[in-house]
């Protein structure tokens, strides 16, 4: 498996039948997006990712498929002995709608050599995102912080993302991800910090709001990483998005986080309204849908919008 020093080593595979079952369950509960990503399995090839997308399309023509990190895309293209753009076109033809901008960690190769030496480098990550945008596939963007990086590395990471966005305008949101260390191999071997302080996490969200301004308009707070109490602070610090409700989150919980299985919408609605804000459902591309009610509280994507 190709991975990073921030990931635990236990791995598993999910069959196409199980993927279809989970998709159908999500649809039955009102989901409008399915998100898939994973590690690099030594037996996966270029057809694996295409078959996953096709299997979802067999059970739904309409659900938005948000899948495969730049690392997975790069792996698929290499297996196919083709360029990234050509491989992305095959995935798009199969039914892929957008990509998660994960596996970014910190976009500096000196840092990446420490935390994820087996992953793609900075330029390779950026090139996958650019290629996706060039064929009409939007992406998210992320940054994992609080491990071995310094403030300069954080600034450089944000600069790389902003420069890319000003060129291609395909990033829908920026998601700062505080490093969850408790079960991460790198931390257990004493090679990283124990994660950012709460104050650091809040400041990174605030700075990202100021720096990205109109270039990346949506700043998402990860309730999976920060919890409900943390989300309350982030709402005062520049975020306008609380992300997805989720049904089966495993990455953060496997690293030791206590949150991530499913969002309590009643509780989060009270937090949002206490900030004089309004909870509004959105889709993956940030089209606003409707205010959540008891009848649609199982919807997956939410958007925060200031009343004023």
For the regions a protein language model found, what residue spans apply to each?
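Conserved sugar-transfer catalytic core signal across GT-A, GT-B, and GT-C glycosyltransferases
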Residues: 2, 128, 230
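Conserved Radical SAM active-site core
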Residues: 9-156, 160-163
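Short connector loops/turns at beta-strand edges and beta->alpha or beta->beta junctions
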Residues: 4, 104-107, 179-180, 247
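Auxiliary Fe-S-binding modules of radical SAM enzymes
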Residues: 21, 27, 159, 165-308
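Short, small-residue-biased leader/transition segments that mark boundaries at the very start
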Residues: 1-8
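Generic signal for short, ordered secondary-structure residues
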Residues: 5, 35, 70, 111, ...
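Helix C-cap/helix->beta junction micro-motif
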Residues: 2, 59-63, 135, 168, ...
């Amino acid at each position: 498996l190709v991975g990073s020093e921030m990931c635990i080593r236990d791995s598993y595979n999910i069959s196409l039948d199980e993927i279809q079952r989970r998709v159908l369950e999500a649809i039955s509960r009102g989901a409008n997006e399915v998100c898939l990503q994973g590690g690099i399995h030594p037996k996966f090839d270029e057809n694996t990712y295409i078959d996953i997308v096709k299997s979802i399309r067999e059970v739904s023509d309409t659900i938005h498929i948000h899948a495969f990190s730049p690392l997975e895309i790069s792996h698929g293209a290499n297996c196919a002995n083709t360029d990234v753009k050509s491989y992305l076109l095959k995935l798009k033809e199969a039914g892929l709608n957008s990509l998660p901008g994960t596996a970014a960690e910190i976009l500096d190769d000196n840092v990446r050599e420490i935390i994820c030496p087996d992953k793609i480098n900075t330029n390779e990550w950026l090139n996958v995102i650019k290629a996706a945008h060039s064929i009409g596939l939007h992406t998210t963007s992320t940054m994992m912080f609080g491990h071995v990086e310094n403030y300069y590395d954080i600034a450089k990471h944000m600069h790389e993302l902003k420069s890319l966005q000003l060129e291609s305008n395909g990033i829908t949101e920026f998601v700062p991800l505080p490093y969850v260390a408790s079960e991460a191999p790198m931390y257990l071997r004493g090679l990283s910090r124990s994660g950012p302080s709460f104050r650091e996490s809040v400041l990174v969200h605030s700075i990202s709001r100021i720096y990205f301004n109109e270039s990346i308009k949506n700043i998402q707070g990860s309730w999976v990483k920060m919890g409900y109490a943390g989300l309350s602070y982030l709402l005062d610090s520049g975020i306008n998005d609380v992300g997805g409700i989720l049904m089966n989150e495993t990455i953060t919980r496997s690293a030791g986080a206590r949150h991530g299985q499913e969002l309590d919408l009643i509780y989060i609605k009270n937090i949002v309204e206490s900030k004089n804000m309004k909870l509004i459902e959105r889709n993956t591309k940030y089209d606003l849908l409707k205010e959540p009610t008891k009848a649609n509280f199982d919807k997956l994507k939410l958007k925060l919008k200031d009343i004023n």
